[in-house]
């Protein structure tokens, strides 16, 4: 049970980190363009 939960968490962690990285990248790009 615990292993399944950990596996699910690790599978969710990657897309969440990619999404956060993409959002941060967009914010930095907008900041650079408009500054």
Swiss-Prot record:
Main location: membrane
Biological processes, Gene Ontology terms: positive regulation of calcium ion import; positive regulation of calcium ion import into sarcoplasmic reticulum; positive regulation of cardiac muscle cell contraction; regulation of ATPase-coupled calcium transmembrane transporter activity; regulation of slow-twitch skeletal muscle fiber contraction
InterPro entries the UniProt entry points to: DWORF (IPR044529)
Keyword Cytoplasm: no
Membrane topology reported for the UniProt record: Single-pass membrane protein
Domain of life: Eukaryota
Annotated TM spans: 14-34
GO cellular component, one term: sarcoplasmic reticulum membrane
Coiled-coil region list: none
Pfam family, one: DWORF
Subcellular locations according to the entry: Sarcoplasmic reticulum membrane
Gene Ontology MF annotations: enzyme activator activity
Keywords for this protein: Membrane, Sarcoplasmic reticulum, Transmembrane, Transmembrane helix
UniProt effect for mutating residue 22 to A: Significant reduction in binding to ATP2A and reduced ATP2A2 activation
Domain notes: The transmembrane domain is sufficient to compete with phospholamban (PLN) for binding to ATP2A2.
Role noted for this protein: Enhances the activity of ATP2A1/SERCA1 ATPase in sarcoplasmic reticulum by displacing ATP2A1/SERCA1 inhibitors, thereby acting as a key regulator of skeletal muscle activity. Also enhances the activity of the ATP2A2/SERCA2 ATPase. Does not directly stimulate SERCA pump activity. Binds preferentially to the phosphorylated E1 and E2 conformational forms of ATP2A2 which predominate at high Ca(2+) concentrations during the systolic phase of the cardiac cycle. Competes with ATP2A2 inhibitor phospholamban (PLN) for binding to ATP2A2 and displaces PLN.
Oligomer and partners: Homooligomer. Can also form heterooligomers with other sarcoplasmic/endoplasmic reticulum calcium ATPase (SERCA) regulators ARLN, ERLN, PLN and SLN. Monomer. Interacts with ATP2A1/SERCA1; the interaction results in activation of ATP2A1. Interacts as a monomer with ATP2A2/SERCA2; the interaction results in activation of ATP2A2.
Name of the protein in its database record: Sarcoplasmic/endoplasmic reticulum calcium ATPase regulator DWORF
Record organism: Homo sapiens (Human)
């Amino acid at each position: 049970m615990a292993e399944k939960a950990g596996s699910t968490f690790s599978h969710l962690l990657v897309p969440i980190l990619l999404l956060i990285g993409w959002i941060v990248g967009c914010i930095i790009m907008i900041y650079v363009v408009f500054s």
